[in-house]
């Protein structure tokens, strides 16, 4: 038994556990309950015609039948229709009607809502990456792994460690990402800067670090996509033109408040002004008495915390997996390039452009949603053709 959901333009299929399924036929009535993989095995002793049906009342809260998909199927179980050693495999689908196909214009409002949500998730991850680039000049390909570790720590506490509600596990995940970012700065990047290592070499090192850490995640976490306890089968709030789950509504609200808070911090707070000063001219900032090493460490901690929050939002939206940070890394780089390299406000604006283009791509080309990242690349190309320095970037003379 599989639940179909329309998630960010793609049809997401999730196994449904605990659903009662019956097979009625020559052997009488045989009943069973699906396991955590949505699978049930029913043993029958006679060949012939069987009706396989879902007990609708056993579906989890928030999971409903699709209007255009049957919840029961009739199969002819005989030697000519068997698979393997006397087995017959049947898939039954439930879930979101929009996942099974509807008019394109009917899907546009939902696509725009998904675009806003994706934009805000990208912005949480990209602002830190932009701040790090602005203060150090480092193109950090390991930033995706900082995104991932926050989601993994929160998942472990939520699912296995203490069974904490996600709202209680989230601060630990955010702190883990901030701590990881701070350790990277103190133990890897600061020593390399003091040795005079070139930015190109440091970028290559970051690629190696990213690959190494990513496969450590795979070894301990495994390759499955998993979900937080609170977000299995959550009901959707129907607003007519579009629907949104309480989970996604929470993502939009929390991300929006955080983005506004970051913008206010950078423009009004003392540390925020110092960060912008170091980003604009590190040598001049140091000459005026600003401790640049301290500011850079603070930038890494803030960037890591924001990345951890972005990872939590991404995990709540699409599930937690070992390479989730790497999956969104291209969108992060596209966002900070579109907005203007090293400009955190540009990262926020660029994230909106990239997120909306990515989701609208799936609306314009619904049959090639696997290539949805092309939407982000198209946004990048179009903006750079018009403004090579990015939307909020500054022109600089080269050579």
Regions found by a protein language model. Give the residues of each.
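Transmembrane helix-bundle core of multi-pass membrane transporters
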Residues: 200-268, 292-298, 367, 373, ...
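Single transmembrane alpha-helix segments in multi-pass membrane proteins
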Residues: 111-155, 183, 187-197, 201, ...
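Alpha-helical transmembrane segments within multi-pass membrane transporters and channels
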Residues: 163-209, 349-354, 358, 387
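Short, ordered, surface-exposed loop/turn motifs in non-cytosolic proteins
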Residues: 2-26, 36, 47
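Short, acidic Ser/Thr/Gly-rich low-complexity loop/linker segments typical of extracellular
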Residues: 27-43
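Inter-helical junctions in multi-pass inner-membrane proteins, predominant
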Residues: 107-111, 265-266, 270, 298-336, ...
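Helix-loop-helix "hairpin" substructures at the membrane interface of multi-pass membrane proteins
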Residues: 243-320, 349
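Cytosolic-side transmembrane-helix boundaries in multi-pass membrane proteins
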Residues: 79-89, 291-294, 365-399
């Amino acid at each position: 038994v599989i639940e179909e959901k329309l998630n960010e333009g793609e049809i997401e299929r999730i196994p449904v556990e605990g659903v009662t399924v019956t097979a009625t036929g020559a052997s009488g009535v045989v009943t069973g309950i699906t396991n955590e993989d949505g699978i049930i095995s029913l043993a029958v002793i006679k060949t012939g015609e069987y009706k396989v049906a879902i007990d609708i009342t056993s579906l989890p809260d928030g999971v409903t039948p699709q209007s255009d998909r049957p919840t029961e199927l009739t199969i002819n179980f005989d030697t000519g229709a068997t698979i393997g050693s006397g087995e017959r495999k049947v898939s039954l689908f439930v879930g979101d009607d929009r996942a099974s196909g509807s008019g394109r214009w009917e899907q546009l409002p939902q696509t725009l809502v998904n675009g806003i949500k994706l934009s805000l998730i990208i912005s949480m991850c990209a602002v830190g990456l932009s701040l790090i680039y602005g203060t150090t000049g480092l193109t950090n390909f390991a930033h995706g792994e900082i995104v991932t570790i926050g989601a993994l720590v929160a998942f472990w506490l939520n699912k296995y460690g203490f069974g904490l509600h996600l709202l209680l596990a989230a601060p630990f995940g955010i702190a883990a990402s901030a701590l990881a970012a701070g350790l990277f700065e103190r133990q890897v990047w600061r020593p390399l800067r003091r040795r005079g290592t070139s930015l190109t070499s440091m970028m290559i090192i970051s690629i190696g670090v990213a690959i190494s850490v990513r496969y450590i995640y795979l070894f301990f976490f495994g390759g499955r996509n998993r979900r937080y306890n609170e977000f299995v089968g959550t009901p959707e709030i129907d607003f007519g033109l579009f629907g949104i789950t309480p989970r996604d509504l929470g993502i939009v609200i929390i991300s929006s408040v955080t983005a506004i808070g970051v913008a206010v911090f950078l423009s009004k707070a003392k540390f925020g002004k110092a960060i912008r000063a170091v980003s604009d001219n590190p040598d001049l900032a140091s000459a005026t008495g600003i401790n640049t090493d301290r500011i850079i460490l603070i930038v890494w901690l803030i960037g890591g915390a924001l990345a951890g929050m972005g990872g939590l939002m991404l995990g709540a939206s699409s599930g937690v997996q070992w390479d989730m940070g790497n999956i969104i890394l291209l969108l992060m780089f596209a966002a900070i390039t579109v907005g203007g390299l090293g400009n955190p406000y540009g990262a926020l604006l660029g994230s909106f452009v990239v997120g909306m283009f990515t989701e609208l791509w799936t609306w314009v080309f619904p049959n090639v949603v696997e290539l949805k990242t092309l939407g982000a690349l198209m946004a990048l190309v179009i903006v750079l053709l018009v403004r090579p320095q990015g939307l909020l970037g500054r022109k600089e003379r080269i050579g």
